[in-house]
UniProtKB/Swiss-Prot annotation:
Annotated source species: Schizosaccharomyces pombe (strain 972 / ATCC 24843)
Membrane topology: Single-pass type II membrane protein
Compartment(s) of residence: Endoplasmic reticulum membrane; Golgi apparatus membrane; Vacuole membrane
Keywords of the record: Endoplasmic reticulum, Glycoprotein, Golgi apparatus, Membrane, Signal-anchor, Transmembrane, Transmembrane helix, Vacuole
Protein name: Vacuolar segregation protein 7
Cytoplasm keyword on record: no
InterPro entries on file: Vac7
Endpoints of the signal sequence: none
Known function: Component of the PI(3,5)P2 regulatory complex that regulates both the synthesis and turnover of phosphatidylinositol 3,5-bisphosphate (PtdIns(3,5)P2). Directly involved in vacuolar membrane scission. Required for normal vacuole acidification, inheritance and morphology.
Amino acid sequence: MSEPKPMQMSVETETVLNVSQVQIPSSCDRKASLETLKTKKNAQKKKKISLPNVMTSKAAMFAARVASAVDQDPNDEESENFVYENLIPTNDDELHSPSASIHSFQTYNLPLEMLPTINHVPYYGSAGTNALNGGPLSNSRKLIPKRSAKFSSMVGSSDTRCNSPTTARGLATSPLQINPTTSKSPLLNKKLSSTSQEPFRTSRRSGQESGDVTTKMLRNLLHKRLWISFFFACFVVLSLVYFHYAVQPLL
């Protein structure tokens, strides 16, 4: 191998005469120098990212916020840490919460048969107060959502028995939204409807009875007035007859 040739550098010099301070004008010292007092700042405008008005889920919102934070200030690590620390759940309870990246029913766009089933909350099970001898309502009974069902924010149950996959996705029904009469037999529904209408029937009967009493009282009063007027007419007729036959001949 051939050895590399050494580099040759040439330096050009030029002699300059010394300039005395007398030749320099005095006005140079009086000029205000702004460049020496203030340093230039690299002013970078933050990019504004237009987010869509409608977000399908919290996961999309999280991704949009992270992307906007990274695009706005790529060199600032504190802003990225702030976004991640505030949005990532730390506890196990928060991981199973309904608000952790839930997709609504509209984003799935699945038919009714493909949707996941909704289990009953165990408050209406065999040990609950609404179960009839442990029969009609149990934990194994399931409900199928309607086609017009939309996503609504539901508060997760604090009971540890409800930690099923459906409750983790926020699809479990809360005990306040369950109507126990809808899943019962038609005969039981008829009995319940009849019992619920009994107060109205009793009030109607009491009103009819009060009306009958008032009509009876009015009839009795009318009969009394008729009898009084009849006796008064008889008295007037008898007095006229007595005056005509007994008193008039004497005059």
